A protein has these predicted regions:
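N-terminal cap/leader regions of alpha/beta-hydrolase-fold enzymes
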Residues: 1-271
């Protein structure tokens, strides 16, 4: 049965907007045509054995450190892509670089505006076509997903759609529960993920979903027993892409999370 409540994305106390000031190493590419077209930031060798799709948080494909994290995956030998998929209407009020939320958007104060906008980005009729274009256009033998916040929802659907070709997914401060906004059952979505999954929730992420006994953690383990989870209690939702790295805990845990995601992705794409 689909969830009847209307879940949000980022819990109270989450990291806010962070401008992207990183000197990128990559380029841009497009996959698909028409409504299914996906513009991407790409980094690394397109002929790599495994491509990693890094699905962004709600500030979209040029949010904070997202492209820097993609470059880190490219440096490890993956073909890394950050898709522009929160782009209905060019993003909310123009978004950030035409995608996602606009700079400085007040998530807490404008929740109704956020909810109205995010409902325009369902899987059925929008993300399914984008995922299809990515899977068809990427040459790599294997594909992995890495999601941040809302991106956790995207990579869960990527895994469900991609079958055995998708070797793993990982999600930092995940918001898979946003599935409920679109009338989906988030637990059922997680159970449909057959590949190993890694969840890295923050200290303020919903423990009923993402704690040691969390329902979505359990559902992902039902899908694949090799799935794993680690809570980061000292940081808040959004820390990897948007957290203040002048804070020692944020800097430390961003690096730890990146290393865990790199190692997990590498391990499960090797076979």
């Amino acid at each position: 049965m689909a969830e009847t409540s209307e879940p949000s994305c980022c819990p109270a106390g989450s990291a806010g907007y962070l401008a992207a000031d990183y000197a990128t190493a990559g380029a841009f590419a497009s996959f698909g045509e028409g409504a299914a077209k996906v513009d991407c930031y790409v980094s690394g060798d397109a002929a790599a054995r495994c491509a990693v799709i890094l699905a962004p948080d709600v500030w979209g494909w040029n949010s904070g450190r997202t492209r820097a994290l993609a470059d880190a995956f490219a440096a490890r030998g993956f073909f890394a892509l950050v898709p522009k998929v929160l782009d209905v209407g060019g993003g909310l009020e123009g978004g950030t670089d035409g995608d996602g939320l606009p700079p400085g958007f007040d998530m807490a104060g404008r929740r109704a505006d956020f909810m109205e906008w995010i409902k325009k980005h369902p899987h059925a009729g929008h993300l399914d076509a984008k995922i299809g274009s990515l899977l068809a256009g990427i040459a790599a033998e294997k594909v992995a997903g890495v999601g941040f916040c809302w991106g956790g929802y995207f990579v869960a659907h990527l895994a469900a759609a991609g079958g055995a070709r998708v070797s793993s997914i990982a999600s930092a401060h995940p918001s898979i529960q946003i599935a409920g906004v679109h009338g989906e059952d988030a637990a059922a979505l997680c159970r449909a993920v057959a590949c190993p999954s890694l969840l890295l929730p923050a200290g303020n992420d919903d423990k009923a979903l993402y704690g040691e006994e969390g329902s979505l953690v359990a559902a992902l383990k039902e899908g694949n027993a090799a799935s794993a989870m680690r809570v980061f209690p000292d940081v808040t939702h959004g820390w990897t892409t948007r957290g203040d790295i002048t804070d020692a805990a944020v800097a430390r845990d961003t690096q730890i999370a990146l290393d865990l995601m790199l190692d997990f992705t590498e391990k499960h794409s090797a076979g």
